[in-house]
């Protein structure tokens, strides 16, 4: 997260000093300050609710949105409260003197107004906006206005480049001092699909540097970080993260504390609740994070299917060209693969179930989901071909040998240990205590699996907050079923969650049954 070092307040006024207090509220990527309405500072300075204020402690400064409170148990008249995220940024102890003053308005607001009016912005405009966003100068309303304006009047490809470049410039950028530094990313929308947890140990076992930082789930049943957290700690101090990447040649960590693209982190907090994921913002978000993390080579997975994020080959090709244009301008080597997104990848949806699938593949367990194994090997093979010593077309065989020989499992165990491993038995995973089965009502073939509906059911069951909750798929596309066969099993820890999930399955199970010729086809690379 971005903070500014300074000894002089931005607005030139003498700040008011109050005792710092930690307020245990998670405001998710928004700095929030709390003042008692009757404190002398409020009356003297004319502070208003939701105003932007500047807070300074021991030479570090952040900007925050102000909330006024009437309850002295939250903050007293001689105290300044800070939300969890804001408190952590200052790195100070509770009770130390903190200075608060009115913040200057964001200088980029005129550029924001032009974008709202539908005008095209230049490079300097985007840089000014991203700098103000990273420094928390924008209110939630202004952030929402920017996101919606960029979505309604779709950014042209030059604007996408300007936005991506600006996101990189306002954050930290790593330099690993070696080449190549590889990474992979999927644009999302497919439940399960935990290929990163297989690709990273395969590529790292080969000796290539793969610093994989991933997100937590916000609207999905599990992100890579949520699933890895079943096996190990994912919240690593920045210095420790860099150290272990050099030692292990890879990591599987949460990227939320690395400050690599702070403006993007703030924007995501607005985009996700609105379900806004426009092509331009998607490209800028993904590429800014990868370049800031020091990657020189990126493998990008674009799944397509009837219920995937991208639903046609034409749409996938347009997105591919936009990614390639921006990546080329930024000096990033990019390989885009368009993959099968007709159904979830793997059997489990939810952190524990997905971790089980990953370990089964690494252990070469006969029960391992074949689709997850095959996709991971193909992706890893493409990444290995970034190595100048690997001939084109040989990557898959090398990846398969690393997996089959147990080297990938050994490397994964080493990464898990370096990140503070947790006990996990994939043969007896710690699943949620309640469950019910969704059954086939006729003899037929599985002709469709709705990614969105199964993800929704898994979330209603409690995933990812309840690690053992989710959906375990027992029948995949094209497989025959008899009436009464279990299509999938839903796990939940609480009766209310189980009831919500059951109601959702009764309205729409997410699995279609029919004849073999009704199974949809999709022409993809793999």
From Swiss-Prot:
Molecular functions per Gene Ontology: 1,4-alpha-oligoglucan phosphorylase activity; thymidine phosphorylase activity
Keyword Glycosyltransferase: yes
Gene3D superfamilies: 1.20.970.50, Nucleoside phosphorylase/phosphoribosyltransferase catalytic domain (3.40.1030.10), Pyrimidine nucleoside phosphorylase-like, C-terminal domain (3.90.1170.30)
Alphabetized UniProt keyword annotations: Glycosyltransferase, Transferase
Keyword Glycosyltransferase: yes
HAMAP family: Thymid_phosp_2
NCBIfam families with a match to the protein in the record: ARCH_P_rylase (TIGR02645), PRK04350.1 (NF003338)
Protein's recorded name: Putative thymidine phosphorylase
């Amino acid at each position: 997260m971005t903070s500014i070092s300074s000894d002089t307040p931005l607005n030139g006024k003498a700040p008011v000093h109050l005792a710092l207090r930690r307020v245990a509220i998670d405001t998710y990527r928004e700095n929030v300050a709390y003042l008692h309405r009757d404190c002398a500072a409020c009356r003297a300075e004319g502070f208003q609710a939701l105003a932007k204020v500047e807070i300074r402690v021991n030479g570090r400064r952040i900007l925050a949105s102000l909330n006024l409170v009437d309850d002295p148990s939250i903050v007293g008249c001689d105290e300044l409260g800070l939300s969890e995220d804001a408190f952590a940024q200052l790195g100070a102890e509770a009770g130390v003197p903190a200075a608060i003053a009115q913040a200057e308005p964001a200088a980029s607001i005129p550029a924001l107004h032009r974008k709202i009016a539908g005008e095209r912005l230049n490079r300097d405009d985007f840089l000014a906006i991203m700098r103000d966003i990273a420094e928390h100068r924008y209110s939630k309303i202004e952030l929402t206005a920017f996101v919606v304006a960029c979505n309604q009047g779709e950014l042209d490809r030059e604007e996408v480049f300007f936005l991506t470049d600006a996101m990189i410039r306002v954050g930290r950028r790593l330099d690993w001092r070696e080449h190549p530094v590889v990474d992979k990313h999927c644009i999302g929308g497919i439940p399960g699909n935990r290929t990163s947890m297989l690709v990273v140990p395969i590529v790292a076992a080969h000796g290539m540097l793969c610093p994989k930082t991933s997100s937590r789930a916000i609207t999905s049943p599990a992100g890579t970080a949520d699933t890895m957290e079943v096996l190990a700690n994912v919240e690593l101090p920045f210095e420790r993260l860099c150290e272990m990447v050099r030692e292990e040649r890879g990591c599987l960590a949460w990227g939320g504390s690395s400050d690599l693209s702070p403006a993007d982190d703030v924007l995501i907090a607005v985009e996700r609740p609105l379900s806004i994921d426009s092509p331009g913002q998607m490209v800028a978000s993904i590429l800014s994070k990868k370049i800031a993390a020091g990657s020189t080579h990126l493998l990008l997975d674009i799944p397509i299917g009837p219920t995937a994020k991208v639903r046609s080959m034409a749409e996938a090709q347009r997105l591919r060209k936009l990614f390639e244009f921006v990546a080329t301008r930024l000096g990033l080597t990019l390989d885009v693969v368009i993959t099968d997104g007709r159904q979830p990848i793997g059997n489990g949806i939810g952190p524990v179930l997905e971790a089980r699938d990953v370990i089964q593949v690494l252990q070469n367990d006969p029960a391992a989901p074949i689709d997850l194994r095959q996709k991971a090997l193909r992706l890893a093979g493409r990444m290995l071909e970034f190595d100048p010593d690997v001939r084109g077309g040989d990557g898959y065989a090398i990846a398969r040998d690393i997996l089959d020989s147990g080297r990938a499992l050994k490397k994964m165990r080493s990464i898990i240990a370096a990140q503070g491993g947790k006990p996990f038995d994939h043969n007896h995973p710690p699943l949620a205590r309640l469950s019910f089965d969704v059954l086939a009502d006729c003899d037929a073939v599985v002709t469709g699996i709705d990614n969105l509906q199964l993800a929704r059911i898994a979330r209603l069951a409690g995933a990812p907050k309840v690690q053992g909750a989710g959906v375990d798929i027992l029948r995949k596309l094209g497989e025959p079923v008899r009436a009464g066969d279990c299509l999938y099993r839903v796990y939940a820890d609480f009766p209310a969650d189980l009831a919500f999930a059951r109601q959702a399955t009764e309205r729409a199970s997410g699995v279609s049954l029919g004849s073999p010729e009704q199974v949809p086809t999709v022409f993809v690379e793999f």
